[in-house]
From Swiss-Prot:
Alphabetical list of SUPFAM superfamilies matching this protein: Actin-like ATPase domain
Name of this protein: Actin
Function: Actin is a highly conserved protein that polymerizes to produce filaments that form cross-linked networks in the cytoplasm of cells. Actin exists in both monomeric (G-actin) and polymeric (F-actin) forms, both forms playing key functions, such as cell motility and contraction. Has ATPase activity.
Highest taxon above the source species: Eukaryota
MF terms (GO), sorted A to Z: ATP binding; hydrolase activity
Residue numbers binding ATP: S15, G16, K19, D158, G159, V160, K214, E215, G303
Keyword Magnesium set for record: no
EC top class, as a word: hydrolase
Principal location listed in the UniProt entry: cytoplasm
GO biological process, one term: phagocytosis
Amino acid sequence: MGDEEVQALVVDNGSGMCKAGFAGDDAPRAVFPSIVGRPRHVSVMAGMGQKDAYVGDEAQSKRGILTLKYPIEHGIVNNWDDMEKIWHHTFYNELRVAPEEHPVLLTEAPMNPKANREKMTQIMFETFNTPAMYVGIQAVLSLYASGRTTGIVMDSGDGVSHTVPIYEGFSLPHAILRLDLAGRDLTDYLMKILTERGYAFTTTAEREIVRDIKEKLCYVAEDFNEEMQKAASSSELEKSYELPDGQVITVGNERFRCPEALFQPSFLGMECNGIHETTYNSIMKCDVDIRKDLYGNIVLSGGTSMYPGINTRLEKEMIQLAPPTMKIKVIAPPERKYSVWIGGSILASLSTFQNMWITKEEYDESGPAIVHRKCF
């Protein structure tokens, strides 16, 4: 690793979107959906050059004829063949690099099964022949990106949400809490409540339309009951959305009922705590001396933290849970959708990080389990 010219690749494989680019850049070069699509129908026209699988944006644009599968669910890879396709697409089509020439920094959710990162390591070294690799914890990278060394990160993506308290650069594993409630569950919930309005969305392709409605129109209410009354008494909260076939649908209280499930998971029939209680419980698992620093540095990260109003609402809920004199501050960086990637880009370009890489030699010597010793 002596020559400085070799740029490391940073790949943040989210359950919903894959963000990839070069270490040292301030934003990912490629952002595409983590989707592999396979044709639902038999081709009738020869010579069309149809493929048996499409990845990312191409799958998204041909979704009308494909069955779309997400190989990553709740932050855990459930289909390694499809995952390999996504990585192949990332390296060769999106970044246009030879992976055997660049170290690769991957990311994963905390409290993932150990086998998951071992398999990631194995594929990087054996399939893509990378010279070196590293697996970073997503929330820790987000904190790097916000320029802090102490804080609690509430990271919520498409597949998994988690709260990770970090003090002076050390993550506190005993206090990390994971919530398998995230963007994809909200999309499914929105599909369900739109059905109650008489709009049926059922296929995997239609789910993508609902995801778009969610991203464009949903917001978090500061006071849910008040907002429900407001929605019932007037139509000022209603917005219209044009479907791809030109028909227009109207969305009303669904706009805030959908993300409300983050605070009231019982909406989804889930028994877990909302993101505010999870954040609070995570802080309470930490040493009493550092709680004040955590309450004052609650950092939001991930695509599901992008709803307008989520930071004011989280702050309001935290004030009700915390001791009365405690100063609560929720930080919502504007680039939080990509902050995991940005943190990875910062980390991989630090000179002090260069001896942290797992090299091909170390892998050949110790096998995939090396990842637990070198990445924590």
